[in-house]
Amino acid sequence: MAFENIISAADKARILAEALPYIRRFSGSVVVIKYGGNAMTEPALKEGFARDVVLLKLVGIHPVIVHGGGPQINAMLEKVGKKGKFVQGMRVTDKEAMDIVEMVLGGHVNKEIVSMINTYGGHAVGVSGRDDHFIKAKKLLIDTPEQNGVDIGQVGTVESIDTGLVKGLIERGCIPVVAPVGVGEKGEAFNINADLVAGKLAEELNAEKLLMMTNIAGVMDKTGNLLTKLTPKRIDELIADGTLYGGMLPKIASAVEAAVNGVKATHIIDGRVPNALLLEIFTDAGIGSMILGGGEDA
């Protein structure tokens, strides 16, 4: 046997040994995963994500996936001649855009994720927040530096989540894959930021962890250094000085709210890293940034 193969085998054995206490600790617990970024678009990362999710289920962890679909939505909007516009990280969504959002998220993207997981031996089931009306939504109005209460169309925030549907799937041994579309009081569809849905769902399921996959290493300071632990106070400072802005704002807000409201650990991790989920859950060092719910020192 070549020496490098021996080293590789030894490394694999060490990793398994390191993972064992975490497998024991987290077996039976719920982990909510916000799936987005490059991990959703690069073939190798997509396949790796599906395998990792199946592995989590095999060792007794209950993954619940909430997915985005920004690049796919943008591509479809461009095909029909509509240009995407964002306010404070939220997509402006008129009626025509909402039809496209629902078609892309609930149709193409959701089904592709479900198919990929099932290809690797999982039992994934795709659902939309409109199914059984389990995600109730209300219109989201945005405050900007120029104006308060900006109406950005059929964009919603989570009013309530009935977890019965998701819990039922978990009890049947399935992996729920949730498209972040909610339903209003008149039955109308609302586009909801996937980070918001993931955070609220993690709260309602009393999840052990909330993992948010991104295209960056985590939360960075102005000099580009990774901040591995953050308190709500520190995050407020980073927003005030402009370090955090745009699409990071709803992600950070959801992570903080989940941490404050009982999710045991919330993490922003780099979805470009192969096996990012396993590295965060099953290794001592973990990866990315952890959001603390209290006033602990960061």
UniProtKB/Swiss-Prot annotation:
It catalyses: N-acetyl-L-glutamate + ATP = N-acetyl-L-glutamyl 5-phosphate + ADP. Pathway: Amino-acid biosynthesis; L-arginine biosynthesis; N(2)-acetyl-L-ornithine from L-glutamate: step 2/4. Its EC number is 2.7.2.8. The keyword Amino-acid biosynthesis applies. The record marks K34, K251 as: Transition state stabilizer. CDD domains: AAK_NAGK-C. One of its GO terms (molecular function) is ATP binding. Keywords: Amino-acid biosynthesis, Arginine biosynthesis, ATP-binding, Cytoplasm, Kinase, Nucleotide-binding, Transferase. The keyword Manganese does not apply. It comes from the Bacteria. Substrate binds at G69, G70, R91, N191. Belongs to the acetylglutamate kinase family. ArgB subfamily. Catalyzes the ATP-dependent phosphorylation of N-acetyl-L-glutamate. This is Acetylglutamate kinase.
